[in-house]
């Protein structure tokens, strides 16, 4: 009888571990589109609703071959602007950035794209003794495709009769510390 209880307990634990592993895999291979509706009197000069798409923290992840699933989802939103909040790549020595580059290069064909660095891009930018000129090459390739980088910078654009300020704040690596 005790052996049966041990086997049942082990089976329950094994099933729980398998279910957890399956959920982790599902989370890693899916993304969620969330819609927010913002209203403000300051936006009254818009002649139609504005769709702003925000991307961040993809960390070189690929959704389908050449990110086709993600790109289709972006296209289906018909964005007026795309804002990138950084960490599109992995800032670790020897880690290629091709996945992020290939996706982001395709976005300016849809609408204007504004990019602010996250801690991974910032690490590559600051730590040239490790990364060499990798950040500058990555940035130049994206700028050549039409991406606008905002590094402690702002751009003022007009949408309808409304002026909109898009700002990018660049934080030094020293700010990105783990909480203890």
PLM regions: where:
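Residues at the C-termini of beta-strands that transition into short coil/loop
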Residues: 42, 56, 117, 153, ...
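His/acidic metal-ligating clusters that form di-metal
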Residues: 75-80, 106-112, 144-148, 153-180
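Membrane-embedded segments
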Residues: 46, 50-148
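Residue-level signal for beta-strand positions within conserved beta-sheet cores that form or flank
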Residues: 34, 48, 162
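Hydrophobic residues on conserved beta-strands that form the core of alpha/beta folds
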Residues: 33-35, 55, 166
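A short, structured loop/turn motif at beta-sheet edges
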Residues: 41-47, 159-160
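N-terminal membrane-anchoring alpha-helices
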Residues: 1-43
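Short beta-strand-to-loop junctions in surface cap/lid or active-site-entrance loops
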Residues: 39-44, 73-75, 167
